[in-house]
């Protein structure tokens, strides 16, 4: 890591939702997934998002990831109203400020770990040397520099998720959004991935937002947001990261 000193949350919200609703369909088929969500995420925080299926957590994460927009309400990112942006502007914001990690890794099967990590930089237009240098540095951060030339089939599930995390951080995003990042891993590999995310959060200051169904994984977060019936039911703060593991 670039620094051995932990970077605490600033207390200032990098993300602020006020009265956010999301409605799908119309008439008899209309469904309100979010019913007025208020939520502040401090810069540098590690937040776990929990709740039963249909509670609104995935819809909220899609909005926070600029993959969807609210039907009503306000979404501020770094103080800027996101609901005023068009599709192309939201795509630019995603590329510049956000990194994504998925349950299923979403790696290209026929390309090396290095080439997978380079992809966001390729889309951004970086030259070949800059891409390689940055991708190797990201792989080194996740402990996989020596596996740079291996394809996903030659890597374990935990290693594949590390490659996916390297791909997510290679652009130095402000926020990392992780959707069930340990869902396809055994308990030992799950803890390793959570320790890696917690380390990135503490030492790099990256804000981590993670959806999980597992309390043991949520214990790595400083803040746990509980959703129920399209609303934030409660927010637990002041967690000691990894306390229950």
Regions found by a protein language model. Give the residues of each.
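ABC-family P-loop ATPase nucleotide-binding domain
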Residues: 1-23, 233-245
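ABC family nucleotide-binding domain
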Residues: 13-227
